[in-house]
Curated annotation (Swiss-Prot):
SUPFAM superfamilies: 5'-nucleotidase (syn. UDP-sugar hydrolase), C-terminal domain (SSF55816), Metallo-dependent phosphatases (SSF56300). Disulfide bonds join 54-64, 360-365, 488-491. GO terms for cellular component: plasma membrane. The gene is 5NUC. This is Protein 5NUC.
């Protein structure tokens, strides 16, 4: 009963308080409820607040979120209560991000998506992570259409012949013909393994298909669902005159109106509205990522086929939302192998990986260098190449308190297991790219050593990549940063340059630091540019697998004058 009461209060509150662009309805008007998800990244099971594994301590504290079971509960409830007025759309990137997908790939993705049963989905770039051969079984196995209008699959016949891959579909919603068109960023050819698939620019493909749907299929309105990011969605809204509503993904953008419901800071209001040159207003929605929210967007269409009003907000899928038993039962046959995944050897190290308290909280440590370099690498390989920049984020700032254990591979012929890595990084935090002014970065570095002493190690002491820092902890607090050099990103050859207070830097950090953890409150109001596809432990795991055997060193990234001197004992 509590759930149903909360549910009705939630929907009533949305309807009452969040009406943002209503207009007087004319005769013949109707309503459509659009439910939407994007960038779920294999969060089939519930997660913690940072969208990684929900640990036992999180369950005890009722701090588990999302998962397909909670999405399913809400979708089923909306469909039961609202019937044919509901249109459930998914904007891609179901693949990649957890051991569930690593182990079971398209098999589990197909089964889980068929339980959710969206009316339609677009492809995401990560759907190509296992190549065309890893995507086609998914396209043939799902029981709903996958819409992507801007693909040229003529050189990949298995894609051309895929059962459920289409450019668009007509749906009857609230008794009216609604055209839905899908799209995918052409950057996918740089981000994943697309084989011989080619791409048409989104705007061109959408305009062509929208004209066809209007002329040949008698579509009354046009909704596009796709995976190109908020910046491109704004362009689509501006340059596609027949498009009425955009459901987006790819940029992992949290849009929200009002006070944030959890740790995610809204990038903009929900929906973002673009006004075309004709005066037509086009709303854009997106629902963050990782199944933590379900997008809810209710629109009013008048008798002329114009969007005249809307209301809605992403719904936080927290512990108050029950988990659908159908999903939980389906997951059980996969669970044991996933739980045993910790025993798997993920790589080899030729050196001790020092994550000890007396090393990483007083000095640069090689475990810190491994972790931060892995974050930089993960961002590089997920970012399109540029003629001017080798990456969009060359700097990582990571709190040493997040490093909880060393790994001594001498005990197992150099082998590193997933369980050992879990012990090093037990918190399961998301990774963000955050736009940080130079003066704020300097302030953060001052904070990182404001409590430094030779007797107590504090968690805020930094581990870094892309920085060379010189501290003097004998100086007064607030004046301990003596010099900082930053590895350039917008350059053809990386080199270290002095930190400039008035310059803005893209910095990779975890969700704990972004939320102000360990006293880093200066980062809380800053905007998140994007969320990396994998969490902290999955990112480091992938890096070790790719680069092994590894042998990270202490390289002089951090110099601490007046600090605790290293001893050989710290390495054992």
């Amino acid at each position: 009963m509590l759930f149903f009461l909360n549910f009705f209060v939630l929907v009533f509150s949305i309807e009452l308080a969040l009406l943002t662009a209503s207009a007087a309805a004319e005769d013949g008007s109707y309503e459509i409820i659009i439910l939407h998800t994007n960038d779920m990244h294999a969060r089939f099971d519930q997660t913690n607040a940072g969208s990684n594994k929900c640990q036992e301590k999180d369950k005890i504290a009722s701090k588990c979120y999302g998962g397909f079971a909670r999405v399913s509960t809400m979708v089923k409830k909306f469909r039961e209560e609202n019937g044919s007025s509901v249109l459930f759309l998914n904007a891609g990137d179901t693949y990649t991000g957890t051991p569930w997908f690593t182990l079971y790939k398209e098999t589990i993705a197909t089964e889980m998506m068929n339980i959710l049963r969206p009316d339609a989905a677009s492809l995401g770039n990560h759907e190509f992570d296992k190549g065309v051969e890893g995507l086609v079984p998914f396209l043939n196995g799902v029981t709903f259409p996958i819409l992507t209008a801007n693909l040229d699959t003529s050189q990949e016949p298995t894609m051309t012949n895929a059962k459920n891959l289409k450019r668009s579909m007509i749906f009857t919603v609230s008794g009216h013909r609604v055209g839905v068109i899908g799209y995918l960023t052409p950057d996918t050819k740089f981000l994943s393994d697309v084989g011989k698939v080619n791409f048409i620019p989104e705007v061109e493909a959408i305009n062509t298909e929208a004209q066809r749907l209007k002329k040949e299929e008698n579509a009354e309105i046009i909704i596009v669902v796709g995976h190109s990011g908020l910046i491109k969605d704004r362009e689509i809204a501006e340059k596609c005159p027949l498009v009425d509503i955009i459901v987006g993904g790819h940029s992992h953008t949290f849009l929200y109106t009002g006070s944030q419901p959890d740790r995610e800071v809204p990038v903009d209001v929900y929906p973002v509205v673009v006004t075309q040159s004709s005066g037509k207003k086009v709303p854009i929605v997106q629902a963050y990522c990782f199944t933590k929210y379900l997008g809810y967007f209710k629109v009013t269409i008048n008798g002329k086929g114009n969007v005249v009003g809307w209301t809605g907000q992403p719904i936080l899928l927290n512990n108050n939302i029950p988990q659908d038993q159908e999903v939980l039962t389906a997951l059980e046959k996969y669970r044991e192998r996933v739980e045993n995944y910790g025993n798997r050897v993920i790589g080899v190290s030729r050196v001790i990986l020092n994550g000890g308290h007396t090393e990483c909280r007083f000095h640069e440590c090689n475990m810190g260098n491994l972790i931060t370099d892995a974050f930089v690498y993960a961002n590089v390989i997920s970012t399109p190449m540029s003629t001017n920049a080798w990456t969009d984020a060359s700097v990582v700032l990571y709190q040493s308190g997040g490093i909880r254990a060393p790994i001594d591979p001498r005990t197992a012929a150099g082998s590193i297991t997933r369980l050992e890595l879990d012990n090093v990084l037990p918190f399961g935090n998301a990774l963000y790219v955050v736009k940080v002014p130079g003066n704020v970065l300097r302030k953060a570095l001052e904070h990182s050593v404001h409590r430094y002493s030779n007797t107590s190690g504090w968690g805020e002491f930094p581990q870094v990549s892309g920085l060379k820092i010189r501290f003097n902890v004998n100086e007064e607090i607030g004046k301990r940063v003596k010099s900082v050099k930053v590895l350039c990103s917008n350059c053809s050859q990386p080199e270290y340059q002095p930190l400039r207070n008035k310059k803005t830097y893209n910095v990779i950090m975890d969700s704990f630091m972004k939320d102000g953890g360990d006293g880093y409150s200066m980062f809380k109001p800053l905007k998140i540019i994007k969320t990396l596809p994998l969490g902290d432990i999955e990112t480091v795991e992938a890096y070790i697998e790719k680069m092994g055997p590894i042998f990270p060193a202490v390289e002089g990234r951090i110099t601490v004058l007046g600090g605790l001197q290293k001893s050989d004992e710290d390495w054992h």
